[in-house]
Each structure stands twice: as C-alpha cells, then as structure tokens.
C-alpha cells in the first residue's frame, strides 16, 4: 500500500477544482492546470480535500494512486505559489539575455542560441550569467531548464557550461605527463 496516497491533498482558499471523470482541472491565481488521471485511480473531492484510492482490478492501483496524489499536490502548489528554477552560465564569454518570449544564449558557438519559451513559462536574467525560470507547471519548468542545460552541459575538466544553481559539478584531474 502507498503511504503517499493515504494522505489527502488540502485545497487552499482561492483554488478551484473541477473533476470530470478522469480529467481534473485546478485553477488558481497563477493560472489553470489540467491533467488526465490513470484509470486505476479513483479521486474524491469533498470539503476542501482530494482523497485517492485504487480501483478494483488493477494490480498497480496503490502505486498509481500515490503518483497521482504527488502530481495533483504539485499542481495545487503551482497554481498558488508557482515554481522557480535557477540556471548559471559558467565560462568566459557565456551570456544569457531574455528577448521577448525567448532566451538568447551565447555559449561559445559561432552563433547565438535562441530558445523559445512555451506558454506559461517566464524567464528573467538578473545578471548576464543567471537565468531564472518561473511558472505554475513543475514538469514544464524542469523540462525547459533541462533543454537549456543540454545546449552546453558542464564539462568535467573545467566545469564550463550551463548548470543548475544547486548543481555540484565534479571535476576530473588533468592528464599528467
């Protein structure tokens, strides 16, 4: 049995929840998020809580219920507080700038890298070597951050590249003659 699924999700004031079969919509001050739930999970909306239970006939019911509870809890946090992800650019001449709905990166290539941001994600650059991504969808924020990091991952000898703000890059020792 999933211990995660047994804990209900508390819905704070100012958040609307619509449950239509297996499709759930959560609306708050930061926008609206919609997700289709697994058929193995039964969700009940009562008072200001969402409770989860597995349906009969599904072997992975409790596991899916725990996953669904974690995803919906992230949706509630996203529409109330939002999520942020910080990236750092380490390297000589590595710079970032926000141009409209895109992030422009100078990463040592012969051309600047332009990355369009999806709807619901905003970016800002407090300095030329920092990018702060903000949005309500936790999965989408992580995917955009991973896409930006993939342009120039931190290399293991000097640590140059795009890294998460809390990432520790393990560096190797240079080859000795």
Curated annotation (Swiss-Prot):
GO terms for biological process: cytoplasmic translation. GO terms for molecular function: rRNA binding; structural constituent of ribosome. Part of the 50S ribosomal subunit. It holds the Pfam family Ribosomal_L6. The keyword Acetylation does not apply. Keywords: Ribonucleoprotein, Ribosomal protein, RNA-binding, rRNA-binding. The keyword Ribonucleoprotein applies. One of its GO terms (cellular component) is cytosolic large ribosomal subunit. Belongs to the universal ribosomal protein uL6 family. This is Large ribosomal subunit protein uL6. PROSITE patterns: RIBOSOMAL_L6_1 (PS00525). This protein binds to the 23S rRNA, and is important in its secondary structure. It is located near the subunit interface in the base of the L7/L12 stalk, and near the tRNA binding site of the peptidyltransferase center. Transmembrane segments: none annotated.
């Amino acid at each position: 049995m999933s211990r995660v699924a047994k804990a209900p999700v508390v819905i704070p004031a100012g958040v609307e929840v619509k449950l239509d079969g297996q499709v759930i919509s959560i609306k708050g001050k930061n926008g609206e998020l919609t997700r289709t739930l697994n058929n193995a999970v039964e969700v009940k909306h009562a008072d200001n809580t969402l409770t989860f239970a597995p349906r009969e006939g599904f072997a992975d019911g409790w596991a899916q219920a725990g996953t669904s509870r974690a995803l919906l809890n992230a949706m509630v946090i996203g529409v109330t507080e939002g999520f942020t992800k910080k990236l750092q650019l380490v390297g000589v001449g590595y710079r970032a700038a926000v141009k409209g709905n895109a992030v422009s990166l100078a990463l040592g290539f012969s051309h600047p890298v332009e990355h369009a941001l999806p709807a619901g994600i905003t970016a800002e650059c407090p300095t030329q070597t920092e990018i702060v991504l903000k949005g309500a969808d936790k999965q989408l924020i992580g995917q955009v951050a991973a896409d930006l990091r993939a342009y120039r991952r931190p290399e293991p000898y000097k640590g140059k590249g795009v890294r998460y703000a809390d990432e520790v890059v393990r560096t190797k020792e240079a080859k000795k003659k």
